C-alpha cells in the first residue's frame, strides 16, 4: 500500500522531512566511513530503522540501494588510488574497505567497464598532469541507470 507523504497543497509532511533527514545522515555516513566495515544492517541500526525500511526508503530517495551507493563510493575512491599508481590492486581493494578482491574486481569492472589492473595501467597515463579534482570528475564511473537517463557515456 502506497502512502502519500505530502500534506495538502503539495507541502512535504513533517514525517517525510524526518525520514529524508535520516536518509541524508545515512548517505553522509557512507561518504565519510566508506572504508570501514559497513553493511545495511549497521547503517539501519544507526538510523533507527529496519534494514528493509532503510533499503526501500534509500532507493526511493536516491535511486539505488544503500549497498550500491556504498560500493560506488568505494569504487570512486579506488579509481583515484589506482590513478596514482603507487598501490597494487589488492592494496587498493582493502584500502577502500572491500574484504573480497573478487567482489571488488567484479563491481569495479561493472561500473568502470574494465578490470582495476587495466584501469590502473591506462588511466595513470591519461590523467598525468591533470589536477586530481578534474581527473576525479572526468573519470567518475557512470552507472547504467545514469546512462539511460542522461545519455552520458554514449558517443
Report residues per predicted region:
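Alpha-helical bundle regulatory/interaction domains
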Residues: 1-53, 60-61, 65, 77-155
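Short, basic-rich loop-to-helix N-cap that marks the start of a DNA-contacting helix
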Residues: 68-70
Amino acid at each position: 500500500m502506497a502512502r502519500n507523504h505530502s500534506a495538502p497543497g503539495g507541502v512535504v509532511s513533517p514525517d517525510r522531512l524526518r525520514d529524508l533527514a535520516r536518509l541524508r545522515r545515512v548517505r553522509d555516513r557512507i561518504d565519510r566511513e566508506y572504508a570501514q566495515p559497513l553493511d545495511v544492517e549497521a547503517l539501519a541500526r544507526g538510523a533507527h530503522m529496519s534494514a528493509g525500511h532503510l533499503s526501500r526508503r534509500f532507493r526511493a530517495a536516491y535511486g539505488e540501494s544503500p549497498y550500491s551507493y556504498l560500493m560506488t563510493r568505494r569504487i570512486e575512491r579506488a579509481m583515484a588510488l589506482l590513478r596514482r599508481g603507487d598501490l597494487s590492486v589488492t592494496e587498493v581493494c582493502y584500502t577502500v574497505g572491500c574484504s573480497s578482491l573478487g567482489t571488488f574486481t567484479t563491481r569495479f569492472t561493472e561500473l568502470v567497464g574494465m578490470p582495476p589492473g587495466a584501469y590502473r595501467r591506462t588511466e595513470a597515463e591519461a590523467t598525468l598532469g591533470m589536477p586530481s579534482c578534474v581527473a576525479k570528475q572526468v573519470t567518475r564511473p557512470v552507472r547504467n541507470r545514469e546512462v539511460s537517463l542522461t545519455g552520458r557515456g554514449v558517443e
